[in-house]
Amino acid sequence: RKESSAASDVYKRQAIESIKEFNKPYLIGAHISEGTNLPSGEKISEIINKINHEKLLGIILSCISPENYDLNLKEIKSLNIPFGFKLNGFVKTNPKPNYTGAYNKSKTGNPNEFLGVRKDLTPEKMLEFAKKFKDAGATIIGGCCETTPLHIKAFSKLK
């Protein structure tokens, strides 16, 4: 685990504690840019195992490449809670350590300048990934950066 994980744990606990006072169901959104660990170094299961599931609706991996979601599917399924995804279409999924520098030098402020846009993720290709993940148990299905209305329309075919 990275040194920042202690601070990260505190922030996660504070976030989860803060929503308890509302006594409402909640969904956890997490981002894994590459591999199987969160940016702070933890596995998803380490976070989920620390919380009370009473009001938890599920977990969603957001802004994740289809391939990286596939890499994390086994662990997320093992949590025995509803799960899903919001797939992205970037070429680079982990722009660190120079993300901030690249963003600041950007002429347009558009992350596509330094993350790139995948041309292979047509609506049909994204539907193939979404079908695979739905068949594996995903119940929350969506798109994130570089998905288009055509991708979402393709996802709507999953019933």
Say what each PLM segment does.
Residues 148-159:
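C-terminal helical cap(s) of enzyme catalytic domains, especially alpha/beta-barrels
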Residues 140, 145-150:
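A short, acidic, flexible beta-alpha connecting loop/helix-capping segment that sits on the rim
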Residues 24-33:
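Acidic, His- and aromatic-enriched active-site or binding-groove loops in soluble protein domains
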Residues 1-7, 11:
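Single conserved hydrophobic/aromatic residue that forms the stacking wall/gate
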Residues 10, 61-63, 144-145:
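Short, thiol/selenol-centered motifs that function as redox-active sites or metal-ligating centers
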Residues 33-47, 51-140, 158:
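Catalytic-face loop-and-helix region of soluble metabolic enzyme cores
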